[in-house]
């Protein structure tokens, strides 16, 4: 089929990456795929590059703190404060020490897809800083070992229905019943590397009969 007018997300709408190459194959790590028109807001958001996000973030962030106030990591008691990372991007982009707390980001994308009223890219900023820290071989060292959820957490949880609506997926949120259809492919190829670590070692050879 022709997917030139569509974008394909591997996994969920929040953390799933946008596939750049559709000539790959399904592995045991794949949970599902979301196919949306290329002009869909979510596809456009996921298509944003580091350079594009950097320029927009520097010019439009109003330091409203909404990204931090709704951040799941922050609400659990961690020192993850996306609005400070946005500030660092604008005023101290080369200060590696100030970028350390970006390591606490779990890349859930709530700040980027829901919280920010200006439609900016706080999560991408954290990804940029994580890349900088990796290149500089700098690791975040926590100053605390015990964390306690902030008292405001129970009032700041995001309703899933509201999130689906904000993502523009309400029209696509419909039952997907299991199908009993049996597929009979002519050829099956199994990658020996579908996980972290060394590739798997085949126990059969080319031409062997496998039931």
Where are these regions (language model features)?
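Short, well-structured beta-strand-loop connectors
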Residues: 69-71, 205-210
């Amino acid at each position: 089929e022709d997917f030139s007018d569509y974008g394909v997300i591997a996994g969920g709408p929040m953390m799933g990456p946008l596939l750049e190459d559709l000539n790959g194959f399904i592995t045991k790590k794949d949970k599902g795929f979301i196919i949306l028109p290329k002009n869909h807001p979510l596809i456009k958001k996921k298509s944003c590059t580091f350079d594009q996000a950097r320029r927009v973030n520097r010019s439009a962030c109003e330091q409203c703190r909404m990204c931090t106030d709704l951040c799941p990591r922050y609400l659990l008691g961690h020192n993850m404060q996306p609005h400070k990372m946005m500030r660092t991007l604008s005023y101290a982009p080369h200060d590696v020490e100030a970028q350390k707390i970006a390591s606490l980001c779990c890349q859930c994308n709530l700040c980027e897809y829901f919280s920010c009223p200006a439609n900016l890219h706080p999560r991408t900023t954290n990804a940029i800083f994580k890349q900088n820290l990796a290149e500089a071989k700098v690791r975040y060292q926590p100053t605390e070992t015990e964390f306690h959820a902030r008292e405001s957490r129970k009032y700041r949880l995001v309703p899933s229905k509201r999130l689906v609506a904000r993502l523009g997926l309400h029209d696509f949120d419909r039952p997907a019943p299991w199908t009993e259809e049996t597929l009979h492919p002519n050829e099956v190829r199994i990658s020996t590397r579908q996980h972290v670590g060394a590739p798997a070692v085949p126990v059969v050879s080319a031409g062997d009969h496998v039931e």
